[in-house]
Amino acid sequence: MNPVEFHPFEMQFEVPGTDGQTVYTRRFQAPRRLIILGCGYVAQSLCRFASQLEFDIYAADDRPSFANPYTMTNAKKVICDSFPAAIEQIHPDEQDFVAIVTRGHKHDADCIRTLYASGITPAYMGLIGSKRRVAGLFENLCTEGIDRSFLDQIHTPIGLDIGAITTDEIAISILSELILCRSRLSLWKKNGILEQTNLDPVFLNALQTKEEKAIAVVVERKGSTPVKTGAIMCVNALGQSFGTIGGGCGEHEVLRKALEVLSDKKDTFLSVDMTNDFAGEEGMVCGGTMDVIIRYVPGKVEI
């Protein structure tokens, strides 16, 4: 399947329950951008790890020996320029994650000033540095007129406290905090919207084709199952599947039911008993159940 440009879109699902139907909307989005300001050794490790966990990496530094495709090998874009100029080129928005890991607080201050001046508050901002030095930096920025409420949204010291010492360990501690924040942002909201940002591009491409398809979503699980609630799979009329709900006999049963949905052109609900099932190719024995909603999506006719 040829890659296509991905445009965010939403899809509604109705989940049967004891008190009637629960309707929620899933918003399919491209992976979140992680903007790494600074391309030193911690940043290089962070870039390497984060790119494997569905972040699109944008990196910047003013040193050519650090800001290049050879040091930030997995970055989608690397900018060698002053930090204020780089931030203006990247255009951070409310969905972005920003990790400020420059080589000194002079550059940290430049980054924070530029972010504040943009009028945009990213979904996540983190700053590397000791509590004492960061406190002094924030005090100086406050005297310049930067709102304290903006500074209070910056995670500092950046990363979860896992006792990190080495460069890779520090990067992992930062990534752990990024994952935690991303997961919290993707939880159910009061308006019933569940964000989906970390899907396989092949699946997203399949979802956007004009052909009819069936979308299977795990909406409830009990016991030991190979995937979490929210796992999703797309099936076309040829029986090709994209994405996974865990493999094994359970997925095969859902695939068979999805073909029936395509034939009947009607949504359905399926409870899959996975007792003694083997998940995927790993030989993992499952002993739980999964409730799966399968929605019919008609094809689009070009006029």
Give residue spans per PLM region:
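Short amphipathic alpha-helix with an adjacent loop that forms part of the alpha/beta core around
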Residues: F83-D93
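Short phosphate-binding/catalytic loops that engage adenosine nucleotides
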Residues: F55, I120, I146
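Short, charged/polar "capping" segments at the starts of alpha-helices
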Residues: S65-P69, R133-G136
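Short, conserved SAM-binding/catalytic segment
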Residues: Y70-K76, E144
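ADP-ribose/adenylate-binding Rossmann-like module
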Residues: A60, F97-D108, R113-N140
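Conserved SAM-binding strand-loop segment of SAM-dependent methyltransferases
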Residues: K76-S82
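Segments forming oxygen-rich coordination pockets for charged ligands
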Residues: M1-D62, P69-T71, D96, N140, ...
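Adenosine-phosphate binding glycine-rich loop
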Residues: I128-D200
